[in-house]
């Protein structure tokens, strides 16, 4: 099986359409379909900050749940939206407010439909996907070699948020360790979460979050070819979001 793994979309629907078309997908059915049966995989954070979060929920639900033609690993923004839809007490900030504004503008029957689709998508998707006979792992923020196969709370925190130290940068964002430098496994770990200006290959890991929602690019990794394909963002460039990893 061949896969096209898509970085953090964050509601950037036009960029997602442009990228999938560049990868050879046809949208005539209303969904991206590849003539060679390649499968899409998503590293999570499909919503928040960008303009079309709800449409991205519908598309990913159709591909993953309804048609079973794609793979989705939830990100930290997905986790927060899931908790919001469950009625938990979450702070509607850091991008969630854009998704909530879209949601609250809908009539109640459409709200219920979106809520049910996203809850189903989240609950029926694993924390990470192990594919191609354990040669490939798709997740949101990365995973340590000794965590592969585990689903406990410690692993969940790592996979959703990265290797956080508990400290904060001046802007309030968490300080993260560079786990990829220590990774010694042979399974390719493909992930996003931390915006980088260029796809970052370190050992057998690839960060493909090139900051589409911050004016960078939306990037895919073609597997097993190990080629990256990107399209430019239509949004303003926010340079401070592309922090050096250390």
UniProtKB/Swiss-Prot annotation:
Gene Ontology CC terms: cytoplasm
Top-level taxon of the source organism: Bacteria
Transmembrane domains' residue ranges: none
This protein's UniProt keywords: GTP-binding, Hydrolase, Nickel, Nucleotide-binding
Statement: the UniProt record of this protein carries the keyword GTP-binding: yes
Gene3D superfamilies reported in the protein's UniProt record: 3.60.21.10
Enzyme Commission identifier(s): 3.6.1.17
Catalyzed chemical reaction(s): P(1),P(4)-bis(5'-guanosyl) tetraphosphate + H2O = GMP + GTP + 2 H(+)
Entry coiled-coil feature ranges: none
Needed co-factor(s): Ni(2+)
GO molecular function term, any single one: phosphatase activity
Record-linked Pfam families: Metallophos
S-S pairs: none
Record carries keyword GTP-binding: yes
PANTHER family linked to this entry: BIS(5'-NUCLEOSYL)-TETRAPHOSPHATASE PRPE [ASYMMETRICAL], METALLOPHOSPHOESTERASE
Family: Belongs to the PrpE family.
Function: Asymmetrically hydrolyzes Ap4p to yield AMP and ATP.
UniProt protein name: Bis(5'-nucleosyl)-tetraphosphatase PrpE [asymmetrical]
Organism in which the protein naturally occurs: Bacillus cereus (strain 03BB102)
Taxonomic lineage of the native organism: Bacteria, Bacillati, Bacillota, Bacilli, Bacillales
Encoding gene per record: prpE
